From Swiss-Prot:
Residues 8-17 have a biased composition (Basic residues). Pfam families: Herpes_UL47. It is found in: Virion tegument; Host nucleus; Host cytoplasm. The gene is sORF1. Coiled coil: none annotated. This is Tegument protein UL47 homolog. GO terms for biological process: regulation of DNA-templated transcription.
């Protein structure tokens, strides 16, 4: 929510040390300036009973295998014990896999008139980035009028200049969509080819997540054995090679699914469809679903959900570009952008965790159906069969800390980040609620539901989850490139959590069938070209301490959803590592990024 030229609020807190965090104490809201709660480090969480039971994985709710009690006797992958039915090579697991992997029939064929209607609906949305939310290959983009080429940057301020936001939206569209606009003209992809790509990408992503569980099992077993021995045992920190094995959220449901297992010699980042059409879609970035032909075939519910995600991220991407210089000049030694970078880094870590949570929920839902199929009760309705990712206790604990920290920062970018996060996190929950309601209605019909009928419901949910994951993956790459460029080229010193970088590195691998990450070199070159072509030159200006906001600025207001999520800090124990200087964190994890800050990646052509 934004208001023009509202009266300014006082800056609630300035964080000068990395070890301090704004939070809620003793279950009651305290004045923001009095908040002094340190980051809860993983090494300092003690022997909390819930965490000892694997609270961050929530095995009781998800009915998964407890990672802290993993022994050969109850490990289905270390013995011949079968769970949830017989999962032989030709058993129900393979049968289920064949149905899931069969060509989806959930995207309708549409004509140009329906596409034009969808494009008009999308672009008619009132937004502070209008009219630059248009599809860059459409008529409305080609007829755009002139705009300010000299936006003003207010570093780490409570307001953003309206023109700077529009320029940011323009640059974001050009940088992130130009390649797909050109590739689309050359390859002319169709709705059917897009559906086939999404179907194959979904199954490959499930293979990646499932196989990662198995490949990390030896590390998890070693950590579990060390814990049981009790001798000088400490929980792994994000710098430990075993940390991700313990801290990832992917659970198997105690079954062997041959169709989901990758050969041991196949790296998960190479499990991607090849060919020119797949390369176009994998390299499309945000443009894939900004393209109206990709949204028009969706059903009405999915159209609304996808539009909501695109609108929210359009504003945030524009706000990010409007908050920092387009060309860093490190010799100036300007540190006034570091507070806004601190906010972006905190949001980045939270958004990475949310994306991993949603991907884990999609894997969980897929395996849940397979397990019920093997047990022969797939046509029995169970309200808790498909877990809501928004009710993940690990996520809610971290939300309380991170959103409270963003809310206390007092910068416009922090508010936009918090509002965008609150909007994005509820969308997969809506899709899951719809799946559960439709599943219940299908099982109450007079006729017995067929396996294909119920799989169709799961496919509809999987379609939206896949779209959501694709857009979030491209957004996280965008945020990562902005942060890396600020630390490396801008010499900005701001804190970031190492755990966020490790999780993001793994997410890039897991989601490689959907998205090819953009290297920093490609990102910087595209941004430089867009700014040069439009002759954009920014000016940095401080906000004067008066009773009025500068003319032409926008003040964003925290949404009610953000305030509700902040209260989760009181209910759940957050598990977080201490932030560290960003430049050192990127150097530590850079090898895991495949050197992507130095050079490009294989674009999958």
């Amino acid at each position: 929510m934004a208001t023009d030229n509202a009266r300014p609020r006082s800056r609630s807190l300035r964080r000068k040390s990395m070890g301090a965090e704004a939070a809620l104490r003793d279950g009651a809201a305290q004045p923001a300036a009095a908040h002094k709660t340190k980051v809860i480090a993983r090494s300092e969480t003690g022997d909390d009973a819930d965490e000892d039971a694997g609270a961050d994985r929530d095995p009781g709710t998800r009915r998964g295998i407890d990672p802290w009690k993993l022994e050969p006797a109850n490990d289905p992958f270390a013995s011949n014990k079968e769970y949830g039915g017989k999962w032989g090579a030709n058993g129900p697991a393979d049968s289920a896999a064949k149905v899931l992997a069969a060509a989806w029939d959930i995207m309708a064929l549409v004509d140009a008139e329906e596409v034009a209607k969808e494009q008009e609906t999308f672009e008619a949305k009132t937004s502070p980035v209008s009219p630059f939310g248009a599809w860059p290959g459409g008529q409305s983009w080609r007829t755009l009028g002139d705009y300010s080429h000299a936006p003003i940057l207010y570093p780490s301020a409570e307001v953003i200049e309206a023109d700077a936001l529009k320029v940011g939206a323009y640059v974001s569209r050009v940088v992130q969509c130009s390649r797909f606009v050109a590739d689309k003209k050359a390859q002319r992809p169709t709705v059917r080819s897009l559906q086939s790509f999404l179907e194959a990408a979904f199954w490959r992503v499930m293979q990646n997540a499932y196989s990662t569980c198995l490949r990390l099992r030896p590390k998890l077993t070693a950590v579990s054995r060390s814990r049981r021995s009790g001798a000088n045992w400490r929980k792994p920190s994000p710098s430990d090679p075993n940390w991700y094995a313990v801290s990832n959220q992917f659970l198997w449901r105690g079954m062997r699914v041959p169709s989901l297992l990758l050969p041991p010699d196949v790296p998960i980042e190479e499990n991607a469809e090849r060919g020119p059409t797949a390369a176009v879609f994998r390299n499309a970035g945000p443009a894939l679903f900004i393209w109206p032909w990709a949204r028009a075939p969706l059903d009405e519910r999915d159209k609304r959900l996808v539009r909501a995600a695109l609108w929210a991220l359009d504003i945030l991407d524009a706000a990010i570009l409007a908050s920092f210089p387009y060309a860093w000049r490190p010799h100036v030694g300007d540190k006034q952008f570091e507070e806004a970078l601190d906010c972006l880094a905190e949001y980045f870590g939270l958004a990475v965790l949310l994306t991993e949570t949603v991907l884990a929920a999609l894997l969980d839902h897929t395996l849940a159906f397979m397990k019920s199929l093997g047990a022969g009760n797939y046509d029995d309705f169970e309200e808790d069969r498909f877990a809501d990712p928004g009710k993940n206790k690990y996520l809610m604990g971290v939300e309380g800390v991170s959103l409270t920290r963003l809310n206390s920062a007092g910068t416009a970018l922090a508010t936009v980040c918090a509002n965008t996060y609150a909007a994005l996190r509820c969308l997969p929950s809506v899709a899951t609620s719809s799946l559960t309601a439709n599943y219940s209605a299908e099982t109450r019909r007079a006729r017995k539901p067929t396996r294909e009928d119920l799989f169709s419901l799961l496919q509809h949910e999987a379609l939206f989850y896949t779209i959501w994951l694709q857009r979030m993956a491209t957004h996280l790459d965008f945020c990562s490139n902005v942060l890396v460029e600020s630390a490396k080229k801008g010499k900005q010193e701001f804190p970031i959590r190492r755990s966020a970088l490790v999780r993001h590195m793994w997410l890039q691998k897991l989601l490689s069938p959907l998205v090819v990450p953009v290297s920093l070199r490609d990102f910087a070159a595209a941004k430089k070209e867009a700014v040069a072509d439009a002759k954009i030159e920014t000016y940095v200006k401080s906000v004067q301490s008066t009773n009025k906001d500068p003319k032409g600025t926008i003040r964003f207001i925290a949404s009610d959803n953000v305030k509700t999520l902040m209260a989760s800090y009181e209910k759940y124990n957050p598990i977080l590592d201490e932030p560290m200087i960003a430049s050192r964190a990127f150097d530590d994890v850079i090898s895991g990024y495949g050197g992507r800050t130095a050079g490009g990646q294989n674009r999958g052509d």
